[in-house]
Amino acid sequence: MTLWASRLIVCAWPIVILALASFRLDLMSFKVPLLAVALGVLLAAIGIVLLILGLLLGAFKGQATLSSGVAVIYFIAAFIIVAPAIQTIMVGASVPPIHDITTDPDDPPIFAHVPSIRKASDNSLELDAGVIDQQRKAYPDLAALILSQSKAEAMILVADTATAMGWEIVRRDEEQGQLEAVAQTMIFGFKDDIIVRIREADGGTRVDVRSASRVGVSDLGANAARIKAYMAALQEAVQ
């Protein structure tokens, strides 16, 4: 039993690595690598169960199967694959299945350049009432940022903060007060599109942000977290 456990765990690693690499290198759409990762996670999870059962059975029969050191190594190797998957499932259950978030649901910023760099198979950028309603309930604290700076000064701060966060700026329109950028997630390399809009308001400026994932049904809260982090960094830059 422990032999099968070790084989499954060893097989899981190349499956996951190749799946991640194929997507990051843009060799195929995200669905196939995602299924491959799920397969790797399943193999690792079964490996953990068989490993534990094998060790318990060996101890009960008084027969040595694997040394404790080797067993720990296999367990850690499998846990590294399984743990993120468990965390993802837990996070996914706690947030709505949406992937387009904005600080202004009444009048969301409209992408101008991003549609030209998206694939036809990517998520739509049309926001319907159902998505807006789910966002209001899930992220009631998401709001615009009011600055005392002029529109030109705010644009400099907005662009500098976006660059500091590692975003790739793909459009900067001083006259319209808009900046579009692309952010990439660490592990899978998913690309999310962001637009920052600056409008004059009450003697200063109002900054709104919209972040939308190109693929997937749920963003697992990533877009809302990105917007909050950006707004916090922007506010800190002003002080």
What feature does the model see in each segment?
Residues L8-A59:
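Membrane-embedded alpha-helical segments of integral membrane proteins
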Residues Q63-G92:
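Internal/C-terminal transmembrane anchor helices
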Residues F188-V217:
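Beta-strand/loop substructures that line and gate deep hydrophobic ligand-binding cavities in soluble
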Residues V217-Q239:
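A conserved amphipathic terminal alpha-helix motif
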